[in-house]
Curated annotation (Swiss-Prot):
It is an enzyme of class 2 (transferase). It comes from Xenopus laevis. This is E3 ubiquitin-protein ligase TM129. The RING-type zinc finger domain is responsible for E3 ubiquitin ligase activity. It is a multi-pass membrane protein. One of its GO terms (cellular component) is endoplasmic reticulum membrane. It is found in: Endoplasmic reticulum membrane. Integral component of ER-resident dislocation complexes.
Length: 362
């Protein structure tokens, strides 16, 4: 392929990925299926279930048209290939065109099947039917969900492609092509995983995401996972009726201070250590009096007479956790992105130090 074709291919790949996974920039610009078809989809607040039935169907159709869009674009980007004359095109392009034509046809047939019987064939309608009473239908369940979603006390979090919504009766996970639904009175919740990232793209602070398994006692309801920021864990628990089991004993950091302590600990453990003689006994930490002091401040960040940090001559008097809490307490709470690079005074002698100067006693 020549330069225009290569440029178009790269640009179209980036556009397709962003159109499918919709980053914040695309949402702000309104380049989403929800925004482009807002007139047909209706309002999520008015009819949550019917909105997502239509949204998931429209999203599948829109995404299936992306290969055809690429082929049409290539007809203009590489006119010398004469792709518009399929019979003269290379075999690889013939296969691609066939796929680009069959894919939207197949999804159109599937969407048409879903729309029959007033959308009763849609996967979301069938999911709701599992929760319906014997003499009722999925529409009664949809009405209940629509009513509860309109209330302002619901719990809602997550990106548009993976939202978690909890109402008084229902736990729901909204993804690009489907909506998982479970009834609160029927579920067991278990924390299964935890991932910590050093920096959040939104706030430049450490962030922890936890994964919770939602399993229903109803055998027809498939289990699903929800993922949320650990700082929202407490709010989620308040909205749930069932307890959340932590079978893996995962430490959940519900505050910024908790996450900072974990990062502080990992950084200090990678620092220089401070050796003491075998006959020297460590005193209890004067901060908590629960464990022995195991931290000594030694200036390692720069040479002795350089920088703002100073040499501390105090004996070990603090444990790692208490020193981390002291370090966090002296920071600007409005700018957590500066915490790791700042200096604070020693809690005893007031000599300034940074994280690099914190040494574990061995």
């Amino acid at each position: 392929m020549e330069s225009p074709a290569v440029t178009f291919t790269l640009a179209y790949v980036v556009f397709s990925v962003c159109f499918v996974f919709t980053p914040n920039e695309f949402h702000s610009a309104g380049i989403t299926v929800q925004n482009l078809l807002s007139g047909w989809l209706g309002s999520e607040d008015v009819a949550f279930v019917h909105y997502h039935i239509r949204r998931s169907s429209a999203t599948l159709l829109a995404h299936s048209l992306l290969p055809m869009g690429y082929f049409i674009g290539m007809c203009f980007a590489a006119p010398e290939k004469e792709l518009y004359n399929v019979h003269k095109a290379a075999d690889g392009w013939k296969v691609f065109v066939l796929m680009a034509v069959l894919l939207p046809i197949a999804t159109s047939i599937l969407a048409f099947y879903w729309s029959q019987k007033r959308w009763s064939n849609h996967p979301l309608a069938k999911t709701l039917a599992h929760h319906a009473l014997p003499q009722s239908s999925w529409r009664a369940v949809a009405s209940s969900i629509n009513t509860e979603f309109r209330r302002i006390d619901k719990f809602a979090t997550g990106a548009p492609s993976a939202r978690v919504i909890v109402t008084d009766t229902w736990v729901m996970k909204v993804t690009t092509y489907k909506v998982d639904v479970a009834q609160q009175q029927d579920i067991h919740l278990t924390v299964t995983d935890s991932r910590q990232h050093e920096l959040s793209p939104d706030s430049n602070t450490p962030v922890q995401f936890i994964t919770i398994r939602v399993a229903s006692i109803n055998p027809r309801v498939k289990p699903f996972d929800i993922r949320l920021n650990s700082t929202e864990y407490g709010e989620l628990r308040e909205k749930l009726h069932a307890p959340i089991r932590n079978a893996a004993n995962i430490v959940i950091h519900q505050t910024l201070g908790d996450m900072f302590l974990d990062t502080f600990r990992s950084l200090v453990e990678a620092n220089h250590t401070y050796e003491i003689s075998s006959n020297q006994e460590l005193e209890p930490c004067i901060g908590c009096m629960q464990t022995n002091a195991n931290i000594k401040l030694v200036k390692y960040c720069q040479e002795a007479n350089e920088g703002e940090c100073q040499q501390c001559y105090c004996r070990p008097m603090w444990c790692l956790t208490c020193m981390g809490k002291w370090f966090a307490s002296r920071q600007d709470q409005q700018h957590p992105e500066t915490w790791l690079s700042s200096q604070v005074p020693c809690p005893t002698c007031r000599a300034k130090f940074c994280i690099v100067d914190v040494c574990i006693v061995r």
